[in-house]
Amino acid sequence: MEIASNKGVIADASTPAGRAGMSESEWREAIKFDSTDTGWVIMSIGMAIGAGIVFLPVQVGLMGLWVFLLSSVIGYPAMYLFQRLFINTLAESPECKDYPSVISGYLGKNWGILLGALYFVMLVIWMFVYSTAITNDSASYLHTFGVTEGLLSDSPFYGLVLICILVAISSRGEKLLFKISTGMVLTKLLVVAALGVSMVGMWHLYNVGSLPPLGLLVKNAIITLPFTLTSILFIQTLSPMVISYRSREKSIEVARHKALRAMNIAFGILFVTVFFYAVSFTLAMGHDEAVKAYEQNISALAIAAQFISGDGAAWVKVVSVILNIFAVMTAFFGVYLGFREATQGIVMNILRRKMPAEKINENLVQRGIMIFAILLGWSAI
């Protein structure tokens, strides 16, 4: 039923506009796609396409196309529904400042700090992985291209300076982070898509292979599930994204709609690009080439160089550097946002047990988290 108000006619309560207490025109204005929406789509894609993307075709080739297809049919819808549920849970929370506070609102402070700690541990592991990767890889490339005589990573201060710069960029605010990430993420996405397209001319239907026995098919599909899921997983950015929308929007319905829309767009782009990329390589190289690539520990880029004639080797060298550095940097940004939010939630949960919330200096807490993140990343190097 529509209700009249001084703002216009409020839409039926069964519609999103009605639940937000808005007319249809107000709802359309509130949910307009803007630069913030673009930024979160970019950050989500950047988080999903990590450095490991170049090894996905090898894993798919080893297991076979039928196994990957079954794994995709199971894994991708399940992950989509889980991420959708995750967003809805966060968006509905009365207090949406960080993941532990959301859990505290549903289950109490003790569960909030327990599940928040588990979430924190997951992000700490990724902080270790990407801090180490970006330090070692960047130093290796500088040495390979003759910029430095030795490896800068041998000095502990190189890693410290690098992590300080990355944390400073990540902490400057969404707009700067979105601007820096956009070019890198679009480059990664285009490289992955281009690699898939470059293989189309070498497709052979016999690389599809025969359908394996049902038991073996299911077993291998389950084994392949982690690779399938992590190929387009970006749950680390969902919590910071929902919190950002909740802080910007007065209406929970608007914040939820925008977060779900950003997730849907990112998921759709990732699914189409990554799925095509993996299938294209499998149809081009087949199982035997995948086994050789696995034994030699080479990536999809090196495989592409073997198939592409002419200046393939030179092209691969440049693209591999760009893809690897951009993948690690944008993934670090996404992980840091989640890490900062998780750490803040745990710290605030503990402090609120000791003192009134209004006496807590949140700016001081955030600065402390920055220092902690730098020291944590540095300790992993």
Question: Where do the model's predicted regions map?
Answer:
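Loop-to-transmembrane helix boundary motifs in multi-pass membrane proteins
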Residues: 32, 37-39, 152-161, 254-255, ...
